[in-house]
Amino acid sequence: MTEDHAVVRSDGGLSRRSFAAVAGTATVATALTSGVAAALPAPAASGDSRGADFDRCLAVARALLVLDSDDRPLVPRYQSVLQKGLPAQRRTRPKNVLVIGAGPAGLVAAWLLKRAGHRVTVLEANGNRAGGRVKTFRSGGHERAEQPFADPRQYAEAGAMRIPGSHPLVMELIDQFELKKRRFHYVDVDSEGRPANRTWIHVNGIRVRRADYARAPRRVNRSFGVPRAHWDTPAAAILRSVLDPVRDEFSRVGRDGKRVDKPLPERLQGWARVVQRFGDWSMFRFLTEHAGLDERTIDLIGTLENLTSRLPLSFIHSFIGSSLISPDTPFYELEGGTAVLPDALLERVRKDVRFDRRVTRIQYHHPDRPSPDVEQVRSKGPHVWVDTVSEGRDGPVVREQFTADVAVVTVPFSGLRHVQIAPPLSYGKRRAVCELHYDSATKVLLEFSRRWWEFDEADWKRELRAVDPGLYDAYRTGRAAADGSLLGAHPSVPAGHITAGQRTHYAANRAVARDQPEAVDVVGGGSVSDNANRFMFHPSHPVPGSAGGVVLASYSWADDALRWDSLDDEARYPHALCGLQQVYGQRIEVFYTGAGRTQSWLRDPYAYGEASVLLPGQHTELLSAIPVAEGPLHFAGDHTSVKPAWIEGAVESAVRAALEIHTA
């Protein structure tokens, strides 16, 4: 799951997307600025006739706060289910259960139901891998993957890469399975582990450290043509100033200057008012009509705070993502890659998983929906019938049918659109399947034989002189060879991974620049640019036994991602390296091993997109129908929660669906 949207928290915290803007800007800006000369929005009024009816808005608020219909928190109960299993007393006999999809939601639901004594079969379209959008490029694993990088010890994330400490259900699974976690540095740190904010902002031909921009933003801001009132205010502070009045509906600023949630009843009502007021607004409309920001200032915020690609999409979607995680929340990564979590889940249900079984048809029994197209199910059972087909990659194409009493459908709605279901689902569900908006996200990862982002200038001198005694000065003066001969030239780069064709393509795409910026000298964190790469991230930790590392050279969403999706995989790597060089300088080329990996979630035949990223109005128009069972069909997956793209949303939905089946 691609972590995941779009805005830096108004109080300096991080949404799923704001790590892409890298909180260094917001964090430093918060300490250095106290306000902004901007048109501040009015409080989110509850009686706006343009909004959705208040009951629907309350339903959305309950979903995002994870409350039941009596406004009681559900998370403690869900945690107890993960710890102790489903309730011991069942109302009916054990059921035959089909789980469609072996992502986190499907695996958790299958594990819980199996522990409770139900007979479970999991159907997964992928021929060899479970985990859905939790995917690690690695050697081996349960999928027995081939070595992805020149160094067999290296691995990198194609999807989910960090886990908030405030996601209790995922943290419960990590602790229960005894997986090793460590801090994920979304803000770069120095060698002592202190926030450094030394990574780069590279926009409009200007390159500046994040900390320097937070202290003196005028040069960058003026390059966007923003009004004089915004010359000396960092982008994060401008954004914070227009979002804070909305957050006042459900939280307040404490004496220590930090946001504190209001009591639950007030919080619920406040969120409902926000949904009613802005539920059918896009982020662009909010920033222009409500916040009164001009186009140039929105360009500044969009570029530095990763809002550009999300401006046409739902304000509520972005605002929820920015508000459910405290600014003090630590983030973690899993040693060995995030895929160790689905590894652990798969171990518990492996014998029940059928890989290479793509579901093409579903029939289900519903007494109120008679249909002449339903031939395989009946009132006395089976209640669910599923037709599948294999992809035939390792043998002949085969069809296989499965029956059950109930099913858990975790397929993304973008993929469920291609599954024939009889009788037809309810109108609300069919509308959600047809209309729920999924976005694109693409990563391009490049392997280097040395962790050059951790170098100081003395390190650069030493390493470049190992290639040629005069090479350090040649790069500094723009005299280094530009014909591709220096690609992977360092002695640490394994031979045999860079072809003559790669050198030619690289030389044709090589960044043309004579200046060489100073060493980054950081651990973790990342940089932002207005070039095609947009956001770049360094590993937070070295891989034991390896002197190199894999850089997330480009992480992009929406239209930015589509620019990469048009390129073949191999064609992306020289472009991504060029974008890195525009930010970090040409000399990084000597450590490039020639190995890269890329993931387009929109082009993925199992994911059908990054995640559900809702359009204006879809929270109130579609959300209520998405998680509701249709007879014996139950629905789970992060798209059925108000935490799309987060593993927490998938686990939350899995526990809900398992309880529905077990207690029916």
UniProtKB/Swiss-Prot annotation:
FAD binds at residues 105, 124-125, 133, 161-162, 638, 646-647. Pfam families: Amino_oxidase. The record marks 310 as: Important for substrate specificity. Keywords: FAD, Flavoprotein, Nucleotide-binding, Oxidoreductase, Secreted, Signal, Zymogen. Activity is stimulated in the presence of Mn(2+), Ca(2+) or Mg(2+). Its EC number is 1.4.3.11. It is found in: Secreted. It catalyses: L-glutamate + O2 + H2O = H2O2 + 2-oxoglutarate + NH4(+). One of its GO terms (biological process) is amino acid catabolic process. Its main location: secreted. Predicted to be exported by the Tat system. The position of the signal peptide cleavage has not been experimentally proven. Its cofactor is FAD. Residues 1-44 form the signal peptide. Optimum temperature is 30 degrees Celsius for recombinant LGOX expressed in E.coli. Optimum temperature is 40 degrees Celsius for recombinant LGOX expressed in P.pastoris. InterPro entries: Amino_oxidase, FAD/NAD-bd_sf, Flavin_monoamine_oxidase, TAT_signal. LGOX is a good choice for alpha-ketoglutarate production from the inexpensive starting material L-glutamic acid. By combining a multi-copy expression approach and fermentation involving two exponential feeding phases in a yeast host (P.pastoris), the yield of the recombinant L-glutamate oxidase is significantly improved. Furthermore, recombinant enzyme expressed in P.pastoris displays higher thermo-stability compared with enzyme produced in E.coli, which makes it more suitable for use in industrial applications. Belongs to the flavin monoamine oxidase family. LGOX subfamily. Catalyzes the oxidative deamination of L-glutamate to 2-ketoglutarate along with the production of ammonia and hydrogen peroxide. This is L-glutamate oxidase precursor. The gene is lgoX.
